[in-house]
Design a protein with these regions (language model features):
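Glycine-enriched, solvent-exposed interface loops adjoining structured elements
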Residues: 1-215
């Protein structure tokens, strides 16, 4: 469903005229803002299948800091692996990395087996440190949940289920105007929560192993 479709879906539900573009009026622009607020809330509520992707980086000998190009500092890593040497990378904390690189007279070199996040670059992409310091070219793969940028063009499409986004935007619009002549704001939020929980339940069925907790 497109950005414009969702905005018009919200407008209809609060008894407003549809628009031919999200930027038609100040009010439709505000509804667009509510749609993006709702989108962010829904995307952050669950590790949606539609948001899962793989980011790769290729190492160089002697370099241990790399940008995850395209991450835009808006990812959750599910797992990471050294695809060249065929094993999973293990996350280590900043103190561990500082000890290996700063407290040691000579940092070990070899095939990378550990990673840590270390800021963002000038493009806004997440920076990753790896250890040992690569001694050759290795391909590292990061399986991530990649949250999407705000919708902006009328034709932009939503990746996550649209009903929770639409109904949460309706709730936000109803709260802003104070009344809708029918359903209360609290009821709108309850409806949105119901759509969200149903959508999560359906998507979670694709990843049942992620709902098993071990003590």
């Amino acid at each position: 469903m497109t950005y414009l479709d969702i905005v018009n879906g919200v407008l209809r539900r609060i008894r407003e005229d549809e628009v031919t573009s999200v930027n038609n009026s100040t009010y439709s622009k505000m509804i667009g803002d509510f749609v993006n607020d709702a989108k962010t809330t829904v995307e952050n509520a669950w590790d949606w299948s539609a948001l899962r992707t793989t980011l790769t980086l290729t190492t160089e000998a002697g370099i241990f800091n790399y940008a995850l190009v395209g991450s835009q500092n808006n990812i959750k890593v599910l797992d990471a692996l050294n695809d060249t040497s065929n094993f999973f990378l293990e996350y280590k904390g900043s103190s561990w990395f500082n000890d290996k690189y700063l407290n040691s007279s000579t940092a070990a070199t070899g095939t990378p087996s550990n990673y840590n996040f270390n800021g963002v670059d000038a493009n806004g992409d997440t920076l990753v440190d790896v250890y040992p310091k690569p001694n050759d070219v290795y391909e590292l793969r990061f399986n991530v949940v990649q949250r999407t940028p705000n919708l902006s063009s009328d034709s932009d499409t939503l990746a996550v289920p649209y009903l929770p986004v639409l109904h949460m935007a309706v709730a936000l619009a109803a709260r802003e105007r104070g009344e809708t002549g029918g359903t209360s704001t609290a009821e709108y939020f309850s409806i949105a929560d119901s759509f969200l929980s149903d959508a999560i339940a359906l998507d979670a069925a694709r990843h049942p192993e992620e709902l098993v907790w071990y003590s």
